[in-house]
Amino acid sequence: MKTHQNHHLFGPIEHVGRIIKSAISKIRDFLIKLNHRFLLPFNRTKQKPDFSLAAAKEPKSRREVLKKLAFLPFFGGIAWTFFSSKESSASPIVPVPDSCGTFQRRTLEELEGNIPQGKLGNKSVSRLILGSNPFCGYAHSRDLKYTSSLFRAYFTREKLIETIHLAEQAGINTLNLCTWEQQHLINQYNKQNGSNLHTMMQVRPTKEDLYSDIDRSIDLGVDFIQIRGVEGDIFARDGNADLLQKCVDHTKRQGYPVSVGAHDVHTFYACDEAGIEVDFYFKTLHHDRYWSALPKKDRLPFGVQGPKNTNRNPYHDNMWCLFPGDTVSYIQKLNKPVVGFKVLAGGAIYPDEAFQYAFDNGADFICVGMCDFQIVENANAAIHAIEKANNRQRPWYG
């Protein structure tokens, strides 16, 4: 009789508790979905973006939304009491053991000096330049398929602002950009935060339209023009160095420093034959002492721009300075600033080693794509590499 009375007493309450628990779950799911609009990258938002540092710190992550909903379980407490005995067979949540390790990101307090600067045109530029390919999702990851989407998901508007601000605080004052949206972002960032970050735009001329990309970039306020390495290689490979000459001359007439980017040293051989005078050089610069580097027997002039191949040996996005010895020899003869890029070989070489190789072998600046948690470590690596390269063969330019 007592058992029947207890069942009669708590049955309705258990039913109410079940309803409350279901409602809580639905509310959480709805608010999380609603909050997704705050996690979209800058170039996907329709509202006018706020590029201030305060806006970047606003709580907009899903975790923070759930923290704000901490009060909801209180209202489901009664229901949970009656469910706990029925769900006791579920596996408990096990804390992550310390043996899994934790990531220790370096802070600004751990900077080990100031990044030296040099001159490009009439601007003082940090010898470590922030590359933007990761911001766009350009990940040279061999045959891994997920890395590009991972970068695009990671670099939300807030994360971009945070990364740029951290780079500025670490002494990086110049960015190499690959989209006009990024230039808009820097313009707003400089305006709202009283900063003076310089920008170098990768432009993409075509045979049909040589100048529009250059003119648009200048109109948006860039400081330097860099003809993208893809176009530099292809124009030179196809015997159209004269078109590169036109792009360089068009930029110079407007008073802007200009470079032809190149993945292949043969691009600069073609530019020299055409008499092209750039203001600075922008060249891939890394060694080939990593396991995924293309075998020497398979390296061909302009191979970086050749068709991608599924076979093991032909080029397949695994090396960007196919002739490092010839590249270093060429750089030694130059009397203008050289910016080395792809120095990490798409993440295959550690920064300490990569930066030292680049500066020892003639680079005056290096352009490196990086995430926020890599900036302080890379700044320190650049500072020390420059210090150790003081006895290098080529004088410093810029």
Locations of regions flagged by a protein language model:
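Active-site-adjacent beta->alpha loops and helix N-cap segments on the catalytic face
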Residues: 181-191, 209-210, 233-247, 324-325, ...
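C-terminal helical cap(s) of enzyme catalytic domains, especially alpha/beta-barrels
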Residues: 373-395
